[in-house]
């Protein structure tokens, strides 16, 4: 792991009026927004909209702009309201926007982004623009986009290519449109899963040579970066924000702890008390899921390959098992490993009738969904993102979000914890852009000082007051009174 040099930063419109013709419709739709956030289980638009691919529906925003592709630009007013609600719960990124917008630290930065497109990510995108960057954006997941939010970004003049329910072909088309545009060339990548990085490296190698740096926020994407580095193919510096303290210990853990319950409730109406659940993986995602479900009265089992994580699970009160020991009896299976084929067709053949199966990891390959597309099995879509899959003997399992990331496909997430991660991403982009040549072609972690700065941006929300070291104490501990307060090897 390369050591990252010390940072010097911060020493540190109107919608189409034909969309809403009656006040009663307007009230109902705004009510839908406030309660559902245009997530997968809620607003989907009219049947006409569902039948037409956005690729074939040429639209203009109120300024006449056409450099975008979203489901329906007419929903921009609803999306703007969602973004404003998120802003009120994202103190860190909003404070960063206020403090740095006059300096324009990203002036000249051309950022291509491939992340989830929801209200929280929209706050980050618009912050990057206010800090001086030009951006082009696509979604990293075909089911997590909030269509109204994408419309609001398009209305604001941001080139955004994303809608909920993209096909695989449309996904890559959108990402290609985000990367390539006449007269525009990216010099920074903000990635979630590594798809933008790999598409650019494969299809636009000349573009990739001009990249100043990559910021990656997911376990899957970070793994892909390290594989590139190991193979000598990573020719630009990259920052792994997934393993920064503020991302890993706050966004990853707390977001998953809250959203797993929301996802399961919205899609299945399950009562948790007494249900047997197996969590595959006990990293920060698995820890959050296990703790949350245990708190609701579930009997929780954990599977792990890492003896350290397994010991943590055991001492947290969970029984550590092999999947084959419990697969016939559990009511819910949750994957949280980032690995491949964690749940195989053989596992699914042995699940009990009515077993709920979902994935909380970024990778869509944790569950062997392709193995379920065989002639003898019957698929029935019973709700948005809820499929009943029936075996010839009448047994049925419930698959959520087709094995993709369930919390962002089937529910909403906490804006506050996303603010922590978004602040980290913004600072990482600023650092890479403002210090060309400082970093070699390697994968870096954020310095402790930057992590502490991000945390400090969020303390005022809780009226939290930090204790200050005396001169005697700082000398005794060998610390600067202004931080950093922990060594890089410290594990929180």
From Swiss-Prot:
Residues 43-64 are annotated as: Disordered. Keywords: NAD, One-carbon metabolism. Signal peptide: none annotated. Substrate binds at residues 192, 217, 247, 251. It comes from the Eukaryota. GO terms for cellular component: cytosol. Its cofactor is NAD(+). This is Adenosylhomocysteinase-like 2.
């Amino acid at each position: 792991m390369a050591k990252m040099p010390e940072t010097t930063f911060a020493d540190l419109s109107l919608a189409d009026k034909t969309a809403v013709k009656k006040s009663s419709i307007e009230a109902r739709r705004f009510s839908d927004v406030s309660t559902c956030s245009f997530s997968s289980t809620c607003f989907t638009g009219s049947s006409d909209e569902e039948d037409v691919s956005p690729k074939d529906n040429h639209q203009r925003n109120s300024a006449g702009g056409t450099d975008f592709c979203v489901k329906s630009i007419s929903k921009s007013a609803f999306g703007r309201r969602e973004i404003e609600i998120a802003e009120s719960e994202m103190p860190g990124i909003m404070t960063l926007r206020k403090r740095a917008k006059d300096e324009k630290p990203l002036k000249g930065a051309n950022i291509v982004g491939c992340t989830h497109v929801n209200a929280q990510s929209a706050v980050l995108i618009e912050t990057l623009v206010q800090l001086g960057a030009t951006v082009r954006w696509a979604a990293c997941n075909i089911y997590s986009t909030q269509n109204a939010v994408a419309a609001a970004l398009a209305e604001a003049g941001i080139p955004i290519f994303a809608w909920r329910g993209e096909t695989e072909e449309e996904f890559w088309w959108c990402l290609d449109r985000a990367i390539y545009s006449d007269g525009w060339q990216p010099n920074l990548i903000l990635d979630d899963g590594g798809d933008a990085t790999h598409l650019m490296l494969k299809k636009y190698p000349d573009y990739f040579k001009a990249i100043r740096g990559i910021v990656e926020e997911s376990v899957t994407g970070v793994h892909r970066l390290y594989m590139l580095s190991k193979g000598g193919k990573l020719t630009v510096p990259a920052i792994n924000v997934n393993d920064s303290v503020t991302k890993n210990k706050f966004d990853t853990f707390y977001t998953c702890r809250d959203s797993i319950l929301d996802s399961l409730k919205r899609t299945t109406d399950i009562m948790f008390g007494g249900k047997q659940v197996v969590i595959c993986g006990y990293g920060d995602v698995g820890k959050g899921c296990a703790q949350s479900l245990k708190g609701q009265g579930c009997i929780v089992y954990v599977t792990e390959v890492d003896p350290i994580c397994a010991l943590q699970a055991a001492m947290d009160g969970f029984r550590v098992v092999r999947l084959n020991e419990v697969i016939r009896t559990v009511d819910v299976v949750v994957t949280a490993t980032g690995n491949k084929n964690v749940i195989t067709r053989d596992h699914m053949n042995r699940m009990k009738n009515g077993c709920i199966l979902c994935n909380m990891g970024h990778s869509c390959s944790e569950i062997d969904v392709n193995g379920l597309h065989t002639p003898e099995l019957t698929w029935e879509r019973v709700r948005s993102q809820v499929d009943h899959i029936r075996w010839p003997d009448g047994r049925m399992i419930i698959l959520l979000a087709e094995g993709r990331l369930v919390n962002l496909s089937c529910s909403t997430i906490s804006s506050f914890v996303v603010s922590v991660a978004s602040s980290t991403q913004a600072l990482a982009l600023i650092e890479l852009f403002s210090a060309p040549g400082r970093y070699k072609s390697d994968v870096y972690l954020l310095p402790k000082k930057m992590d502490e700065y991000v945390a400090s941006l969020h303390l005022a929300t809780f009226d939290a007051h930090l204790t200050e070291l005396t001169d005697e104490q700082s000398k005794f501990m060998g610390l600067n009174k202004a931080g950093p307060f922990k060594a890089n090897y410290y594990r929180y």
